[in-house]
Amino acid sequence: MKKFFGILLTLAMVLSLAACGGNDKPADSSTPPADSSQPSADAPSGSASGTFKLGGVGPLTGDAAIYGNAAMNGAKIAVEEINALGGIQFEFQAEDDVADGETSVNAYNTLMDWGMQVLVGPVTTGAAIAVSAEVYNDRVFALTPSASSTDVISGKDNMFQVCFTDPNQGVGSADYISQNMPGAKVGIIYRNDDAYSQGIRDTFVSEAGKVGLEIVSEGTFTKDTQSDFSVQLTDAKSKGADLIFLPTYYQPNAVILNQAKGMGYAPTFFGVDGMDGILAMPGFDTSLAEGVMLLTPFSADAADERTQSFVSKYNELHGETPNQFAADGYDAVYIIYEALQAAGCTG
């Protein structure tokens, strides 16, 4: 399925890259972009050549650094492999946005001054929403590896996503829990000032109502209150929640797992893609992750040759197993490569 989705995405991107000049004016806002789920039979094909400046934006420092570094490291491996093939060549430069919208726009502008032609990123949702408006106005082609809110691409015909979207994560999680853990009493802890967390929570709750999943507790937090979850955990425990759904990033999740253990509370914890990377967090007690479940589009244990080659290279270079953000960064560069080839672009 992921391979098929990749083919559809590449074909949609070919349409966006067909002019290869990036100077088209934005489409009239009253006219929606073409439906990228149905690739055109007339998509251009050809042989691309030349050197393209590929920029990357993501959190290389700060609370979400595990995501950004993994995505950029994965992208770099793909760049090296593609450059070794001859033909299209990529110059790659990554900028740090600390997962902040304003900083991300500044990082994007730095790359534009460098001469960037195609953007890989931003990595996180809030930053990607901020940058997507600039990308659309500048008519720069962009592909985010992992920013999963539909707001990232809504109304923009030159911004794409590798990852699955927040609505799909919320629906998929609720469906899985209802089918595999019937009778579960669910507590939710989410960040209500973050589009990513709020978006997944909303679709999870909506789907839970449709499939008869019982939600007994909900607790919220903000960017400034993610160091103590005792109130949220106490409420969930007192109401009998035996599963805690966490549509949140790895850093608050680590605090939640640690505090739950400290209060003798041991529900099943179920995270989404933001949970990925928690095992690589400095100082994290990995025993706390025993039994934790998460929704992820990538498994480093997959037996196919290409996955194992990527995992081996990543481990050799960085001394750790790649997470889904690394895989998404890697895939993003190959999707761009295939789109450039199909469109016959010249650098």
Q: Model-found features: residue ranges?
A:
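Short, low-complexity disordered leader/linker segments with a strong preference
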Residues: 1-53, 84-87, 113
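Signal peptide-proximal N-terminal region
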Residues: 45, 49-51, 72-92, 209-214
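Extracytoplasmic "Venus flytrap"
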Residues: 48, 55-76, 95-102, 124, ...
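Periplasmic-binding protein-like
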Residues: 56, 111-123, 143-145, 187-190, ...
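Beta-alpha junction/loop-to-helix N-cap segments that form part of ligand/metal-binding clefts
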Residues: 66-73, 84-153, 221-227, 254
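Hydrophobic alpha-helical segments within soluble ligand-binding/sensing domains
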Residues: 104, 162-185, 198, 226-230, ...
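An alpha-beta-alpha
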Residues: 159-220, 243
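Extracellular/periplasmic periplasmic-binding protein-like sensory domains
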Residues: 257-330
